Regions:
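Short, conserved phosphate/pyrophosphate- and ester-handling motifs at nucleotide-, phospho-/glycolipid
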Residues: 28, 112, 200
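A short, basic/flexible loop-to-alpha-helix module at the beginning of a structural domain
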Residues: 89-101
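Histidine-anchored nucleotide/phosphate-binding helix
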Residues: 113-124
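Ferredoxin-reductase
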Residues: 1-84, 136-137, 162-164
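Reductase modules of NAD(P)H-dependent flavoproteins
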Residues: 132, 137-227
């Protein structure tokens, strides 16, 4: 464990240095993390949890973000310290964003923004990408420094919503993220877009149903379902 950053309200970013030259995964995939001892010769993997990988491939470290929601993540909050050695295994999952000429709409609720960063940090010259990112409080905005850098890119379009935000002159809208908000922002591009959903299960279900009701085909809606 090389770095632990707290965002408050039980939300943490962890950076783990890996003992190999680089990690191999595709943007959108996840890893398993265990707090318990593991013997690679036994073939038995202990209790673990899965987390989206929030760092770029081919780095000597991996980054994850988690929020304290149950007993296991509470253990993580209590037991993880810089310098501690833990076991992870990767990569897993098929929530892989496909490059297309049509608009890509990445919808994130809370820590659900994590799997998008390896994709967003890849160099590109064309193809519009819209990140619709909703959080409850302003201090829950993750990767704010990276967002500021991306805002200078012509292909990147940020739509940031803070549920309990104010109407101050800040770079976000106050309110809850919704499909109607996305449709209003995209206009005629809404029907052309591919949608990626990542966040709390209730949010994902609501967005999927709302997109379907507006005529978006299932093949154009991609869901991060490991949660």
């Amino acid at each position: 464990m090389s770095k632990i950053q707290s965002f408050g309200s039980g939300v943490y970013e962890l950076e783990l240095t890996v003992p190999v030259r680089s990690t191999k995964f595709q943007p959108g995939q996840f890893l398993h993390l265990t707090l318990d001892d593991f013997d690679p010769t036994s073939g038995w993997w202990p209790e673990s949890r899965v987390f989206s990988i929030a760092s770029e491939p081919k780095q000597t470290f991996v980054t994850i973000v988690y929020s304290v929601k149950g007993n296991y993540t509470k253990r993580m909050e209590d037991e993880l310290v810089v310098g501690k050695k833990i076991w992870i295994k990767l990569p897993y999952g098929d929530f892989v964003i496909q490059e297309k000429d049509t608009p890509l709409v990445l919808v994130a609720g809370g820590t659900g923004v994590s799997p998008y960063w390896p994709f967003l940090l890849k160099p590109r010259e064309t193809g519009a990408v819209h990140l619709f990112y909703g959080v409850r409080e302003e201090n829950h905005i993750l990767f704010f420094d990276k967002i500021q850098i991306l805002k200078s890119q012509k292909w990147f379009h940020l739509h940031l919503m803070v549920e309990n935000g104010s109407v101050k002159d800040l770079p976000y809208k106050a309110g809850r993220l919704s499909v109607s908000e996305i449709k209003n922002e995209l206009g005629e591009k809404f029907d052309l877009a591919d949608f990626y959903l990542s966040g709390p299960p209730v949010m994902i279900k609501t967005f999927k149903n709302d997109l379907t009701s507006l005529g978006i085909m299932d093949s154009k809606v991609h869901i991060d379902e490991w949660e």
